[in-house]
Regions:
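Feature of multi-pass inner-membrane transport and sensor proteins
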Residues: 1-5
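Mid-to-C-terminal secondary-structure elements
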Residues: 123-136, 149-226
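A short amphipathic helical element positioned immediately N-terminal to and/or at the very start
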Residues: 7-16
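Short, strongly hydrophobic transmembrane alpha-helices
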Residues: 18-45
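Membrane-proximal extracellular/periplasmic loop immediately following the first transmembrane helix
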Residues: 39-104, 215-225
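Generic structural signal for small/hydrophobic residues in well-ordered secondary structure
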Residues: 15-18, 25, 46, 62, ...
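Short acidic/polar micro-motifs at solvent-exposed secondary-structure junctions
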Residues: 64-76, 98-125, 135-148, 187-189, ...
C-alpha cells in the first residue's frame, strides 16, 4: 500500500514540476477518450439502422444504373414494373414492395387544409416486408383496396386528434381516402421515412398496376423497389 502511495506522490510532484506539459497531456487524453466514445456511439447508431425489421437480413433494395448522355448514374429509383417482373422471373423472391414518395399533397378534412410532404404510395405488401407496430387497425388488407390509407400516429393526431381515426376519411388531390390503420411513428434509425401511406392502387388502370407488359410502366421510374 505504501508503495502505491509513493508512486502517487512521485507522479504528483512530477506533474507539478511540468505544469504546462501536464495540462497538454491531460487535454490530449481527454480529447482522445471523448473522440473514442463519440465514434463508438456514432457507429452503434449507424449499425442499428433497420434492425427493428423482423426480416432485416433478407430485405434488399434494388438500385438502377442509368446511362444518359455518356454519363452513368446509380440511383435507388427504379421502373414501376420492376417489382412484379422480378417476382415472376425469380422464385427466390418471396415478396416485393414499391414505395413512391409524393413531394407535395394537399389534404382537406372538412374546412381544414394541410400541405403534406411525407406521404407515399405503397403496395399492400409493405407490411409483409417491413415490420411496423400497429396502434389501430391491422396490417392485413390495410392497403389492398384503392383509396385506402395508413397513417403514422403523429399524422393521425394532427388530422383527427387523439382518437381512433380508422373509418375516417380525408380528401387528397381530389380523391377521398379511407383510413384503415394507424402505425407507430418510424424510429430515427430507419432509412425509410414517411408520415402516411396511400394504396398504390389508387387511381389509374388497376389491372396495369401489377402488369409487366405495358411499355408505359417500364418508362416510369418514380419509386423504390424492395
Amino acid at each position: 500500500m505504501s508503495m502505491i502511495k509513493n508512486y502517487l506522490v512521485s507522479a504528483w510532484r512530477n506533474m507539478m514540476r511540468s505544469k504546462l506539459y501536464t495540462v497538454i497531456n491531460v487535454f490530449c487524453l481527454t480529447v482522445g477518450i471523448s473522440s473514442a466514445i463519440l465514434t463508438a456511439l456514432y457507429l452503434n447508431h449507424e449499425l442499428s439502422y433497420d434492425r427493428h425489421h423482423e426480416h432485416q437480413d433478407r430485405i434488399y433494395r434494388i438500385d438502377g444504373v442509368y446511362h444518359v448522355g455518356g454519363n452513368t448514374s446509380h440511383m435507388a429509383i427504379t421502373a414501376f414494373a420492376l417489382g412484379p417482373a422480378l417476382k415472376l422471373e425469380y422464385s427466390e423472391i418471396q415478396e416485393y414492395v414499391r414505395i413512391s414518395p409524393i413531394p407535395d399533397m394537399l389534404i382537406q378534412i372538412e374546412d381544414r387544409e394541410f400541405l403534406e410532404q411525407g406521404l407515399a404510395f405503397a403496395d399492400s405488401t409493405i407490411f409483409d416486408v417491413f415490420t411496423h407496430e400497429f396502434v389501430y387497425g391491422r396490417a392485413m388488407g390495410s392497403l389492398s383496396e384503392p383509396n385506402t390509407a395508413v397513417l403514422t400516429r403523429s399524422l393521425a393526431d394532427k388530422f383527427f386528434g387523439d382518437v381512433d381515426p380508422t373509418g375516417s376519411t380525408f380528401d387528397a388531390n381530389g380523391q377521398t381516402f379511407l383510413v384503415k390503420a394507424v402505425i407507430e411513428d418510424l424510429p430515427d434509425n430507419s432509412h425509410i421515412r414517411f408520415d402516411g401511406l396511400l394504396s398504390i392502387r389508387s387511381g389509374g388502370n388497376q389491372d396495369a398496376i401489377y402488369s409487366v407488359e405495358p411499355r408505359l410502366f417500364w418508362s416510369i421510374s418514380m419509386n423504390y423497389t424492395y
